[in-house]
Amino acid sequence: MKISSGAINFSTIPNQVKKLITSIREHTKNGFASKITSVKNTHASLNEKLKTGKSSSIEFALPQKIKDFFQPKDKNTLNKTLITVKNIKDTNNAGKKNISAEDVSKMNAAFMRKHIANQTCDYNYRVTGAAPLPGGVSVSANNRPTVSEGRTPPVSPSLSLQATSSPSSPAEWAKKLTDALLRQKAGETLTAADRDFSNADFRNITFSKILPTSFMKRDGDIIKGFNFSNSKFTYSDISHLHFDECRFTYSTLSDVVCSNTKFSNSDMNELTLQYSITTRQQPSFINTTLKNTFIRHKANLSGVILNEPDNSSPPSVSGGGNFIRLGDIWLQMPLLWSENAVDGFLNHEHNNGKSILMTIDSLPDKYSQEKVRAMEDLVKSLRGGRLTEACIRPVESSLVSVLAHPPYTQSALISEWLGPVQERFFAHQCQTYNDVPLPAPDTYYQQRILPVLLDSFDRNSAAMTTHSGLFNQVILHCMTGVDCTDGTRQKAAALYEQYLAHPAVSPHIHNGLFGNYDGSPDWTTRAADNFLLLSSQDSDTAMMLSTDTLLTMLNPTPDTAWDNFYLLRAGENVSTAQISPVELFRHDFPVFLAAFNQQATQRRFGELIDIILSTEEHGELNQQFIAATNQKHSTVKLIDDASVSRLATIFDPLLPEGKLSPAHYQHILSAYHLTDATPQKQAETLFCLSTAFARYSSSAIFGTEHDSPPALRGYAEALMQKAWELSPAIFPSSEQFTEWSDRFHGLHGAFTCTSVVADSMQRHARKYFPSVLSSILPLAWA
């Protein structure tokens, strides 16, 4: 019985076979525009054969488009192809299981895979790892008997993919991968062949340009289960992608940009992995193997799976190279330890945290033996390079930051070589940071450098007192660093006890002021005066201060107080009222000098002094006024008749009728860049200048308890009056303004102490416009 393709009569065919033919027809017409041209039964009635359990054959002809894939000699044998249906007994559409579209697709794809790959090979296909195809269906070709024993080939690709030629360019490979990923993203289950990109060529491909942005996002889409074995990624950019359960065996990833690329649960054995210099953020390897893989020295291997190395030879690279083993990984080493090689391979502090030291150390502690062996090989190489101290000097910090920690301290070879390096590093730290603040310690410094410095002070206890500036900073950061371990804090506290017991220190701590007031530090509060710095010039002089004060003086802000400490001589507290902070820091405690001077240069009060008292006309007075700003109290007083007269001669022309002259007012605006400022901003500046001149007239500077220079009082009041005219809103109230004005002039029985006025005005400015006050008021008066 022959039935035309346009009107196939399915009435005599069981339901399962109907579904099979319909599915094959639907599946093939999309890929190859093929049509089933005939369906016929053989010698006996199809229904009769199905009833008796015998095999029946349904024949359909392959379209010409498929035949064209085969050699001419094989084409004649492909005219007829059988789909054999075995042991289908149910003719009443009540079979236990119909043939699914998925099973039909697999059958059809298996048929095409075998014929395209082998052309004349017959086989019996079964779904890998599953039960036989429904209804006992198998696929055969060329009218040959089917093989009764089922084999288990790899999961086969879809018909459409295998029936096309392989991509011939990186762009075509990129398109093929994009198509596969989009299908997978859409929910389609890809076969192994769909995910087979072995021998692919992705050279110079920037994946962010071909893939949806969702693949580059954190916790975005994942490239999962793909086979990239023996593929080329040279000069490609795979940044921010996540490859999971992928295979890269024997692939080449040379000069590849892989910033923040994630490889998880993947096979990356036997490949070349060389990052491009434009890789800013290291890739990560999670539960990934790198057996015999060649890796450059800048990598993070925290999630790598190491195994015992085999006897394979080191990889060969262009230009040659030296290598060391890290477990079963090959790490690149320089051919020669030149200056550039030392910096590039060892100086992670100069190379964004990347070096061969950090690469080895990035492995988890369970690989301690492998890490130590690799570091020993590195040290042997350095020792063999006969590097000079000058060559090692720039990388001393990087070396001790890794090698001075466990597990490398357990190696006698490493410790012997590192000892002199650590000594030179410590000497340089003492020389550099005893008189200047340490850089603000980040996590790296707290966890890797501070413990090394503690160990060095422990070995050289004399340095605690000879370099107390550095020692106190180290203890400070160990006790306050949020990333310091408890072990580091405990060791720091123990070392400080040794320091306090030193004869040069102990006389200063039994005065009822130190720590918990009985001579012991109190580490439970940052307000306790636990720190004691020795003078760099006078062994009898020391400074006692709290944790908070020490921190703020080392890293000051405009509001930092520079007198919140005890100055001790022979253990006794002495007044700092008439001591210039800048001179004290320059002579005795230089660790604060740079920070103090930096803040002082931001104070612009001196510009008004230069306007009023030019150095050409009033050189001596100018020096006296400037010198007074460097201390809280002045021994120079300007209340004698000659001084009062001289000051009146200078200030009276600036204050016609007791108010600022227009010309002088414009000079002030110009000096402080306020010409185009708002009235409120001008008023705030004038208010703060008034505060400073009120201080000049007080008993603390040029006045006494009973008298003060009238010209300075009048000038301070004139500045305040102008501020009121410009913006009354900056004052507490009109009543407060009137009270301050009366105090300046002694009117209405007001108390005339300008120290009280200066303090009151200063408190108000600090509360409502602190930045303006901090830009003007001298540090010693703050």
Swiss-Prot record:
Localisation per UniProt entry: Secreted; Host cell
InterPro entries associated with the record: SopA-like_cat, SopA-like_catalytic_sf, SopA-like_central
Protein's UniProt keywords contain Ubl conjugation: yes
Top-level division of the source organism's lineage: Bacteria
Alphabetic keyword roster: Secreted, Transferase, Ubl conjugation, Ubl conjugation pathway, Virulence
EC number, UniProt record: 2.3.2.26
Region described as Disordered: 140-170
GO BP terms, alphabetized: protein ubiquitination
Name of the top EC class for this enzyme: transferase
Location (main, coarse): secreted
MF terms in GO: ubiquitin-protein transferase activity
Low complexity composition-biased segments: 157-170
Function: Effector proteins function to alter host cell physiology and promote bacterial survival in host tissues. This protein is an E3 ubiquitin ligase that interferes with host's ubiquitination pathway.
Family: Belongs to the SopA E3 ligase family.
Protein name: E3 ubiquitin-protein ligase SopA
Species name: Salmonella agona (strain SL483)
